[in-house]
C-alpha cells in the first residue's frame, strides 16, 4: 500500500496521453450506450425505455414495463511491465432492471439475458470500436470485447418484483 499526502498547492499537467486515455474511455461509454439504445425486440421496438451513463439507483427500481439500462466503466488495467502508458484493458458494466410479478419478471429477465449474450457474441458492433477524429486517420481502439460475468438477481419491491440483469465486459485496448 502506498501512502500519498495531499498538498493543496499540487497541480498536474494534463499530458496528451492522459487526454487520449480519457477520450478512449469516453468513446467506449458512448459506444456501449449507443449499442444498447439501438437494440430492438421481436416487434422492432426499442428494447430499453432509457439508457443512462453511470450507475443509477433508479435503475434498481425499474420504470414501467420496459427495462432501463445503465452503462459505466469500473476499472482500467495497465500492462504489468509499464511499457505502455495507456490502459490495456477497460472493464465496463451494463445493468438492466425489469419489473413485474415474480414469474413474469424472471422469465423476461432470462429472455433479456439470453438475448444480450447472443448480441454480444454475434453483433459486430459490440466487438470492435474504431475512433474517428478530425484530422486523424481512423484507428481501432478496442480490438476485442468479451463478457466476463453475467448475473440475474430478484429484488422484492412491495407486491411486485424487480429482476436485475448485470453484465461485466472486458475491452482489450490496442
In which residue ranges do the predicted regions lie?
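C-terminal tail/extension regions appended to the core domain(s) of diverse proteins
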Residues: 1-13, 160-174
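Small/polar-rich, solvent-exposed N-terminal microdomains that initiate assembly or binding
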Residues: 2-84, 125-139
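Acidic-leaning, charged glycine-interspersed low-complexity segments
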Residues: 38-40, 51, 64-69, 111-172
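Generic structural motif
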Residues: 56-58, 74-76, 97-101, 157, ...
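Oligomerization/assembly interface segments of phage tail-like spikes and tubes
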Residues: 85-103, 159-171
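Long, charged/polar, surface-exposed segments that mediate recognition or autoinhibition
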Residues: 94, 98-117, 121
Amino acid at each position: 500500500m502506498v501512502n500519498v499526502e495531499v498538498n493543496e498547492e499540487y497541480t498536474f499537467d494534463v499530458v496528451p496521453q492522459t487526454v487520449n486515455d480519457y477520450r478512449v474511455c469516453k468513446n467506449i461509454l458512448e459506444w456501449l450506450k449507443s449499442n444498447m439504445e439501438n437494440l430492438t425486440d421481436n416487434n422492432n421496438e426499442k428494447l430499453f425505455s432509457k439508457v443512462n451513463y453511470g450507475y443509477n439507483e433508479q435503475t434498481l427500481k425499474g420504470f414501467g414495463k420496459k427495462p432501463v439500462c445503465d452503462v459505466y466503466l469500473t476499472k482500467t488495467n495497465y500492462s504489468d511491465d509499464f511499457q505502455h502508458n495507456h490502459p490495456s484493458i477497460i472493464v465496463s458494466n451494463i445493468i438492466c432492471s425489469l419489473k413485474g410479478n415474480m414469474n413474469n419478471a424472471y422469465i423476461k429477465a432470462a429472455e433479456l439475458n439470453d438475448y444480450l449474450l447472443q448480441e454480444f457474441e454475434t453483433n459486430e458492433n459490440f466487438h470492435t470500436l474504431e475512433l474517428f477524429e478530425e484530422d486523424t486517420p481512423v484507428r481501432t481502439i478496442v480490438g476485442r470485447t468479451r463478457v466476463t460475468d453475467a448475473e440475474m438477481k430478484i429484488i422484492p419491491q412491495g407486491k411486485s418484483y424487480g429482476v436485475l440483469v448485470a453484465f461485466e465486459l472486458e475491452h482489450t485496448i490496442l
